[in-house]
Amino acid sequence: MPSPQKQKGSSFEREIAQFLTKTYNESFIRAPGSGAYVGGKNQSRKQVLHEGQIRSFKGDIVPGQSFPLFNAECKSYKDFPFHLVLTGDCKQLDAWLDQLMAVSEPDDLNILFMKFNRKGKFVCVQSKLTWVTDQFLYYTSKKHKDWLIIEFDHFWKHNQDLIKTYSNKSDTTSIIKSETKNLLPSLNLH
């Protein structure tokens, strides 16, 4: 029988998959076995798998068909040391980013979903992409550069379309320019 922490993590992965399925009207599922089957020391497995198989074994969520660049990890924990994010030395967050980025390709949209007891849900995304928010924590990882931590509902309210766009295109520079141009005139963050 799985440990209570593993069950909690699996439950959160299913919750996120269901949320994404409902949000985008496309099938997202919890990855089978949910682990880095093609990450870390298992990179060589990519040589014998086709794109769909690789996508199925990246991260915790198998994305819908129109999200080929989507790479996600889900973490559900009792607590989180937010104060260490502010000091720039959060080993827990660094370990999660290591896990997320171990299976990442250069053009992937990498997103870390986090849930903490009595604190809520959050997303952590790379700041190299343009995101619409006025409420965030900024974190610089020594290994993985700059990230934003944003409250879950606020993030999805303002970035739902950007997630789909970034997950489907590899030319993020032109996406950023056109999406920012379209969003700024009508931006109302509150």
Residue spans for each PLM region:
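Short Gly/Pro-enriched turn/cap motifs at secondary-structure boundaries
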Residues: 51-53
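Nucleic-acid nuclease catalytic cores
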Residues: 104-132
